[in-house]
């Protein structure tokens, strides 16, 4: 059981790390350098001040999230029979991986049309094209759906209050943003 839990945790951590860094932060920095991403602060000169300020904001947000995770990593009051725990973890892992793969599929389908908006307004590229293939043929906001699915999978695996909070908060925030 310990080896199985370790494998589940390793897959979840690797998936979260990939989504958080490779897709978001790396793409965001590349977009800022190309002048394609929306920024929180107006550009100054060559944009180095903006990039440094935004990276500072990202790092501060990560610290706040780490503190919240530490404080709210409280198990839900759900009794799971020890014999059912591996099946529940495996089911949660399948849901988590499906959500993660859906996000990756949606991101790859967007190609260069993808960018991270750090404001309430989405900045369209000059040669913007509506993407209607891949997962976008199935659902209007597949990256949001994939995120919710991955969070649901993590909730099934770990059953903690922080994941309930994140899922509820992201449902509200993404729903409002999508409208």
Predicted regions, residues:
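Membrane-anchoring alpha-helices and their flanking helix-loop junctions
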Residues: 1-125, 129-132, 149-179
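Histidine-centered phosphotransfer motif of kinases
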Residues: 132-133, 137-145
């Amino acid at each position: 059981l310990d080896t199985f839990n370790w494998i589940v945790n390793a897959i979840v951590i690797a998936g979260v790390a990939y989504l958080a860094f490779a897709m978001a932060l790396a793409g965001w920095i590349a977009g800022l350098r190309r002048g394609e991403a929306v920024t929180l602060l107006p550009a100054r000169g060559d944009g180095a001040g903006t990039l440094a300020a935004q990276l500072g904001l990202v790092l501060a947000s990560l610290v706040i999230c780490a503190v919240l995770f530490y404080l709210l990593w409280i198990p839900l009051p759900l009794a799971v029979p020890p014999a059912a725990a591996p099946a529940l973890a495996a089911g949660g892992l399948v849901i988590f991986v499906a959500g993660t793969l859906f996000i990756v599929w949606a991101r790859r389908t967007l190609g260069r049309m993808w960018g991270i908006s750090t404001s309430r307004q989405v900045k369209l590229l000059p040669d913007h094209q509506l993407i209607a293939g891949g997962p976008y043929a199935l659902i209007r906001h597949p990256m949001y759906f994939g995120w919710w699915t991955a969070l649901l999978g993590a909730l099934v695996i770990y059953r903690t209050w922080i994941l309930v909070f994140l899922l509820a908060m992201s449902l509200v925030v993404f729903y409002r943003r999508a409208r």
